Regions:
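Active-site-adjacent "lid"/gating segments
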Residues: 1-29
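ATP-dependent adenylate-handling ligase core
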Residues: 2-7, 55-162
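Phosphate/oxyanion-binding active-site loops and adjacent basic polyanion-contact surfaces
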Residues: 7-15, 35-42, 69-73
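A generic local structural motif
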Residues: 17, 36, 149-153
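A phosphate-binding catalytic loop at a beta-strand-loop-alpha-helix junction
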Residues: 22-55
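Single conserved hydrophobic/aromatic residue that forms the stacking wall/gate
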Residues: 165-173
Length: 173
């Protein structure tokens, strides 16, 4: 429990306070959802908050689909997005940007969803995904982390003020 003045609050209570502030101060909130545990908890906290407080609003979800990922992760992502489609605006990204790899001695990057490699794709693109044609900023030189920044700028132009809420396990101390 953390000390707040003379009050003691649980982590959950502090999260609810933060969500109250976020959903009060920002018209457009979106969550970065990888399908992992941390981002899954964050997304579900936001979904639960919207439902429990009967907010008349939608929540954006930014999901980079890297094509090659655990099958169970893909099923989990599909399940969460489908079961909450009534309140989610999903940005499922299937773009052939550069992604760092250590699986090759000859290449330092690979490209998910690269059209020229379609016969080797692990699976087909999901329905209603966003592709490189949807983004005027896309170039073949773009790395995945650069895409994330440019996506935020792109979304800001479309929706005015936005807040991206992320869960970064690498930041956990």
């Amino acid at each position: 429990m953390r000390q707040m003045g003379n009050l003691r609050s649980s982590v959950y209570e502090v999260v609810l306070e933060r969500l109250n502030r976020i959903f009060s101060d920002f018209d457009n909130v979106y969550v970065s959802f990888s399908g992992g545990k941390d981002s899954g908890v964050l997304l579900n906290l936001c979904i639960d908050y919207i439902r429990q407080n009967k907010l008349n609003r939608r929540l954006g979800v930014f999901h980079i689909d890297y094509e090659v990922q655990y099958e169970e992760t893909t099923r989990y992502v599909d399940r969460v997005l489908a079961s909450n489609s009534d309140i989610l605006d999903v940005y499922r990204i299937c773009v052939p940007f550069k992604v760092t790899t250590c699986a090759s001695m000859y290449q330092n990057y690979w490209r998910p969803w690269e059209d020229s490699m379609r016969p080797l794709w692990v699976r087909e693109k999901p329905e209603n995904c966003y592709t490189k044609e949807d983004f005027d900023f896309y170039t073949d030189d773009l790395w995945d982390y650069e895409f994330q920044i440019k996506f935020a700028e792109w979304l800001h132009k479309r929706n005015a003020a936005c807040l991206l809420y992320t869960s970064d396990a690498a930041d956990d101390k």
